[in-house]
Amino acid sequence: MKDDHDKEFVISILRNSGLQVQPIPKATHQTPDFRVMMPDGDVLVEVKSKDDDQQLRNLLKSPKGTPLSYKVSLIETCIRDAWRQIHDFPNRDEANFTLVWFITRKVGGITVLTNSFAMGLLYGTELLEGRKVGRKEFYRKECFFFRESIFFSKKKCKDLDGVVLHDVQSIKLCLNPYSPRYSVFKHTTLTNVFRVKFAVVDPEEMEAAGECFIAYCSVDREDKNGIVRYLKSKYDLDTVKIIRFVPFNYPVD
């Protein structure tokens, strides 16, 4: 869901950051919301937002100890629909960058979809821990593209350059390293504004800094053992354990 207030709010953020924004008039065909005009090229942007989360409301009303089994298909559909609005835009140039701005939680909203949760949908992240070969050095790091994800899948959002995750606490630009324009988009005026004023998630920069692992391989994402073998070989890992946290309804008495 999205209303005009969301779009105008995002436009005001960008304009206050010194960027030139041109709203795109509504038409009978699919259109993105606006265009960010830069010396590096234009960025077509579609804004989407997450309303109050009925799944979380159901959990809060459930018996004590009930785990949350979260269905992410609606979120993925929302992002794919946003991408199609950009992709099918008749005035889109192949050189245009593409960006989905996703408001994951509004002020006063109730949702489990925090930015960290949404990042898992984009990047297929898993938290891994274990020890390295020989030195037995302990590690705990996130692994990008360990499982199927929006950016990894060529069928979901092909050549989408990035997604902005926006909640009441932070605004992050998540770069897609699988986009054919990744190496250019990461150095654009828009991305540089995010680096200075907000935040940028760039898996390759994080890997170079030793902050994460990346499963850059063609192994089927259903083959977890195959992914683990790849990571062990790439990073000299001895043991690999997946760490997952599941929300439960445990009210404070």
Language model region names:
Residues L14-P39:
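A short acidic/basic microdomain associated with nuclease active sites
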Residues M1-D4, V10-N16, K48-D253:
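Metal-dependent nuclease catalytic core centered on acidic motifs
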Residues F34-V36, V43-D51:
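Conserved catalytic cores of phosphodiester-cleaving nucleases, focusing on short active-site segments
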Residues D42-V43, L99:
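Beta-sheet entry/capping signal
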